Amino acid sequence: MGFDRQYSREFVRTFFTSPAAVTDAEDSAKMLQKGAQLRGMQAPDVWVPDNEDATAPVMRDEGVQNIVEVVAQHGADFPGEIHPRIVWHRPDPAMRYRGLQQMVKIADPDAGAIDHIDGFVIPEVGDVDDWKKADEAITQAETQHGLEAGTLS
């Protein structure tokens, strides 16, 4: 017996974060590789390759490259949404610029990952001014690569 909803609602059942790069490992992308290959009930609705809190600052450049490579390789088969988390700190313009650069690298169509990325997690966005700065950065990443406005969220 079917059920007709009187409304439409979307929700996230689960999300999963993976460090974008780990130190002291033969393969710094090993945690991303594991997250990208989760399937069935083990797979989250949203996977967050985390290049912020979960990744050591000295590993973040490598983390961006790992995100690009792993998502390009496994993104088409991942059953949920993919939202990489970039660095972003509202009081620090230099950190916001690094976050923009991370988005630009991840969104590069020639790198092969962007077709599988649903958006970005931008941490520490607080007031309306923060939202505007984050939106401006996303728009810059889209524009730089000729992506349609709204491609990234």
What would you call each of these model-derived segments?
Residues 2-153:
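Conserved alpha/beta-domain cores
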